[in-house]
Structure formats: structure tokens, C-alpha cells
Amino acid sequence: GKNAIDVLVAIQQMLQNLHMDPAEVCSAKLTKMVADGGSINIIPGKATFSMDVRAQKNEVVRELQQRIEKGFNHLSQMFDVDIRWDWLDSTPGAEVSEEAAKIAELSIIEACGMDYLAPAVVTPGSDDFHFYTTKQPDLKATMIGIGADLAPGLHHPKMAFNKEALQIGVDV
């Protein structure tokens, strides 16, 4: 029979060999692989996998998805297996409105003073909270960052921050 683990490894290698424009921030990574034949001496004939595909720009995400699909088709032929996939979810890039960013800048100055205004940054990747502009293209949106002494890091199980900083966001 065919070993599903071989196909998973080939998918991983295919992702590692995807090369996009180096000026574009993007990534495609396997985040979950499950292949279980039921016993240690049974080669698994089926597997499931999940991946995280993200980029700074939504058009780059779409291009990555197209290249990944092309890779799946090639691997399907190479291993003579059926690789089925669905893009169940996506992680969009930020669509920042200059008008909304200017309003946020003025609000920060008004609420907190000029010393609290930092230069705008371009986020290097996509995130789930950018859905509002992809689902409502007419919506003008921006993001603000509030220093809140977050530690030890975002998504860490023991993440904590200064909750008093939330009032700054309310004021802005």
C-alpha cells in the first residue's frame, strides 16, 4: 500500500520549496499532521493535515493558495493518491484606510497628547482580526497599538498585561 506519511512529508517539502517574491512577507506552514494505521506495525493509508497560510497582502495569500493547490495536484499525480483539501479558513492581511488612520492619529493626540503618538508600522503578516475589511470592503479601518506591558508574550499561556491600559483605548 501507499504510505500516507510519505505524502505528508512531501507536502512539507513542497511548502518549504515555495518561493515567492522576497519583498513580500508571507508563510505557509503545516500546523497539524495525523496519520495512524492503528498499530505501530501498520502503514497508514490515510492522513489529515492542517496548514497556516498568511501574508501581509491578501493578493499574496491568494497566490500562495494557488501555488499550494498546484503542488497538491503534482503530488497527487506523483504518489498516485487522492489529495483532498478545503480552504476552511483564511487569515487576511490588513487593509488600512488612510482616512481612518488619520482619524486615529488625531484621536491619540487629542486623548493622550503628542508624546503618545508613534509612527505607523506596517504589520508583517495577517491576522484573524482583519476580517472586518474583507467582509465589508466599504468599511474604512485602521488599528491602534496601546502599550500595556504585555508579558511574557502574545499567545503565551501565562500572558498578562496592565488592564489599566484599556482605558487609554477607551479614551482614544
Regions found by a protein language model. Name each.
Residues A94-A111:
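Short, low-order "capping/linker" segments at domain edges
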Residues V81-R84, I109-T123:
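C-terminal helix-coil-helix/basic helical segment that borders enzyme active sites and/or dimer interfaces
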Residues D21, M78, E110-A111, K135:
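Alpha-helix C-cap/termination motif
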Residues G1-E95, T123-D127:
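Midchain, well-structured core segments that form catalytic/ion-binding scaffolds
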Residues M51, A104, Y132:
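Hydrophobic, well-ordered secondary-structure elements that form the walls
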Residues Y116-V172:
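Zn-dependent metallopeptidase/amidohydrolase metal-coordination segment
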